[in-house]
Amino acid sequence: MKIYLVGGAVRDSLLGLPVTEKDWVVVGATPEDLLAQGYQQVGKDFPVFLHPVSHDEYALARTERKSGKGYTGFVCHAAPDVTLEQDLLRRDLTINAIARTEQGDLIDPYHGRRDLENHVLRHVSDAFSEDPLRVLRVARFAARFAHLGFQIAEETMALMQKMAHEGELAYLTPERVWKETEKALGTSSPDVYFQVLRDCGALAVLFPEIDNLYGVPAPAKWHPEIDTGIHTMMTVAMAARLSPEIDVRFATLCHDLGKGLTPPELWPRHHGHGPAGVKLVEALCQRLRVPNPIRDLAKLVAEYHDLIHTVQVLQPKTLLKLFDAIDVWRKPQRLEQLALTSEADARGRAGFEDTPYPQGDYLREAFRVASQVSSAGVVADGFKGIDVRNELTRRRTQALADWKAQQPDASATS
């Protein structure tokens, strides 16, 4: 029985990146051998075991044969005679098909180390096309390693395009699509993930609402990049600079979906695109089973991001209505999330990347002023029932009016 460290742990250590989890392959053993040593079997479809002390995953060397559609249609063969090279051959990318012995020696039959050094994402074999999930995985790795200069090999991109064209992606479950997308949103370059999906034809299949934005023009005065799809990718890249939160990045991705509904004869203007986009956000999130908190923020951002751009000229009553609409009294974190998504929208434009966004600080300060007026103070003054809310609104409106009167003339700068 021989044990090898494989996959991401080897890859990341060679790249000088932190290793967060370790996966091992066991060659020349049976399930009974591992169970006798105290390992716990956890894989139903695959022979995967947990180490009795470290709880790392140990998998028996295996081969896989395509038996149906999608990423679950495989027959797995695990036996003591399966070699390490056979096990590595079934993996997606050469950079993930490197093994390390217990003595520290590298085993690299498919030249993954060379591709690491050349910053290339390349499939190991044509068996890559048997698993449609790998299209998303490659897009995610492209996003994760974009800052290191990694590019997808031409032959790998051609294979991904073929898979998208032949309809294999239709067999992916919503949960798997969202899981890969969520991981990609957490990388330093989430926009690259969606760009790769578009380049291979997968975006139109999995995210048609986003794909529809390409070719939709916006006024050149406000959007020098003109194309709404390009603007969306620029805003996602900006959101990644501004916030590590998946919620903020996903909401930014969805903020302009309504522009895809504008009739061409009305281009390049998109009046009312915010509220119009809410239904598209809802549909996308339901289809991919996006968690409710992420969905709810995305819907609010779609509806209110344009209003936040004009926050400096809003009347106190309108400001309070905005705070009520986003439920910021019970969920104060939403204020910062909306401020950041709106800033990403404003700065995610050609030539505006380093432009200040004073609306964000104005929104934060307005909320601070309004929240200093508490319902406890109103109750202490003897108000009861519905009168508490009415008086609270009146006092907050007055507080905002007094504060607003002390601000510089916003119309001159907005």
Curated annotation (Swiss-Prot):
Annotated catalysed reactions: a tRNA precursor + 2 CTP + ATP = a tRNA with a 3' CCA end + 3 diphosphate; a tRNA with a 3' CCA end + 2 CTP + ATP = a tRNA with a 3' CCACCA end + 3 diphosphate
Q: Name one Pfam family in it.
A: PolyA_pol
Q: Other remarks on record?
A: A single active site specifically recognizes both ATP and CTP and is responsible for their addition.
Q: Where are the transmembrane segments?
A: none
Annotated family: Belongs to the tRNA nucleotidyltransferase/poly(A) polymerase family. Bacterial CCA-adding enzyme type 1 subfamily.
In terms of CDD domains, this protein maps to: HDc
Q: Which EC numbers characterise this protein's activity in its record?
A: 2.7.7.72, 3.1.3.-, 3.1.4.-
What organism, scientifically named, is this protein from?
A: Pectobacterium carotovorum subsp. carotovorum (strain PC1)
Q: What is this protein called?
A: Multifunctional CCA protein
Single Gene Ontology BP annotation = tRNA 3'-terminal CCA addition
Gene behind this protein: cca
UniProtKB keywords: ATP-binding, Hydrolase, Magnesium, Metal-binding, Multifunctional enzyme, Nickel, Nucleotide-binding, Nucleotidyltransferase, RNA repair, RNA-binding, Transferase, tRNA processing
Top-level taxon of the source organism: Bacteria
Positions that bind ATP? G8, R11, R91, R137, R140
The UniProt function text for this chain reads: Catalyzes the addition and repair of the essential 3'-terminal CCA sequence in tRNAs without using a nucleic acid template. Adds these three nucleotides in the order of C, C, and A to the tRNA nucleotide-73, using CTP and ATP as substrates and producing inorganic pyrophosphate. tRNA 3'-terminal CCA addition is required both for tRNA processing and repair. Also involved in tRNA surveillance by mediating tandem CCA addition to generate a CCACCA at the 3' terminus of unstable tRNAs. While stable tRNAs receive only 3'-terminal CCA, unstable tRNAs are marked with CCACCA and rapidly degraded.
